[in-house]
């Protein structure tokens, strides 16, 4: 005999609750705390973490100041002010990158031109030497 519809839905909700509850319990008891995670790091990484903690705290305080000034202003939230939006292209960085690549290309081009000029000078010098040798060894006034 088939069970009533409400019993089947009760089973569905009970199984769903067990799945969600077991997931939450697993997450709670298997995820390490911050102290456990730091203690499990190697000594070098732990030292690096400790030295950079003050820097991260200063960054966080600076961010909170910016957030407070942004919250006090009458401008819309999408005008981020001193904070650069991740969706806006950072034109300054792009320009610096282009200038760096252009300067590097100019240096490479100058070096290539110097190398070519040096090779050309060597070829001209060899050509002049060969011409002088031919002129010195050949008598131009003899017909035979």
From Swiss-Prot:
Location(s) in or outside the cell:
Mitochondrion inner membrane
Name the domain of life: Eukaryota
Regions that span the bilayer: 5-27
Q: Its biological function? A: Essential for the assembly of ubiquinol-cytochrome c reductase. It has a direct effect on the correct occurrence of the Rieske protein, core 4, core 5 and apocytochrome b.
- Cite the PANTHER family for this sequence: ASSEMBLY FACTOR CBP4
Family to which the UniProt record says this protein belongs:
Belongs to the CBP4 family.
Protein's UniProt name:
Assembly factor CBP4
Could you tell me the gene encoding this protein? CBP4
């Amino acid at each position: 005999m088939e069970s009533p519809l409400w019993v089947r839905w009760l089973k569905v909700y009970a199984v769903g609750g067990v799945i969600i509850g077991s997931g939450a319990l697993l997450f709670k008891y298997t995820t390490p705390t911050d102290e456990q995670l730091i203690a499990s790091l190697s000594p070098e990484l732990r030292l690096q973490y400790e030295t950079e903690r003050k820097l991260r705290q200063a960054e966080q305080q600076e961010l909170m100041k910016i957030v407070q000034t942004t919250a006090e202003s009458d401008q819309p939230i999408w005008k981020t002010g001193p904070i650069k939006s991740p969706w806006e292209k950072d034109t300054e960085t792009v320009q610096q990158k282009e200038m760096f690549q252009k300067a590097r290309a100019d240096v490479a081009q100058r070096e290539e031109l110097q190398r070519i000029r040096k090779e050309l000078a060597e070829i001209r010098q060899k050509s002049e030497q060969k011409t002088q040798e031919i002129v010195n060894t050949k008598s131009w006034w003899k017909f035979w």
